[in-house]
Regions:
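Short glycine-rich, Thr/Ser-proximal phosphate-binding strand/loop in the N-terminal lobe
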Residues: 2-39, 74
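Generic secretory/membrane-interface signal
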Residues: 1, 6, 26, 58-62, ...
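Residue-identity detector for threonine
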Residues: 11, 53, 89-92
Length: 118
């Protein structure tokens, strides 16, 4: 299975193309914490565009803030003040026409450790 993993941080957005647990391609874009929601979303799309292929099946996103994974909403990111109640799952899913899953980055780390070990 091929999927895209994304880490939205306060200083960088990182994306990787992962196949069978191996990172085949990765890309990173610096984030200006003072940028608008729209600018950061555009940077996010640019980053994903560098790693996505027509074989990609899903996109997973880790966010360092308050997230409702079931609703797909990012309520707050401390290091990106412009992000308040962003319906991130819907935005990314509509842009790429793929299923998208988001969660707090610490939860993503814990799930990865449980599934794959350190």
């Amino acid at each position: 299975m091929e999927f895209i993993g994304v880490d939205i941080g306060g200083t960088n957005i990182k994306a990787g193309n992962v196949v069978d647990g191996k990172i085949l391609k990765k890309h990173s874009i610096a984030v200006n914490r003072e940028s608008s929601e729209e600018k950061i979303l555009n940077d996010l799309f640019l980053c994903i565009d560098q790693v996505i292929t027509n074989k990609s099946q899903k996109i997973g996103v880790g966010v360092p803030g308050i997230v409702d994974p079931s609703a797909g909403i990012v309520y707050d990111i401390q290091n990106i003040p412009s992000w308040k109640e962003v319906p991130l799952t819907e935005i990314i899913s509509q842009h790429y026409n793929l299923p998208v899953f988001i969660n707090n980055d610490a939860n993503c780390f814990a799930m990865g450790e449980k599934l794959f070990g350190i």
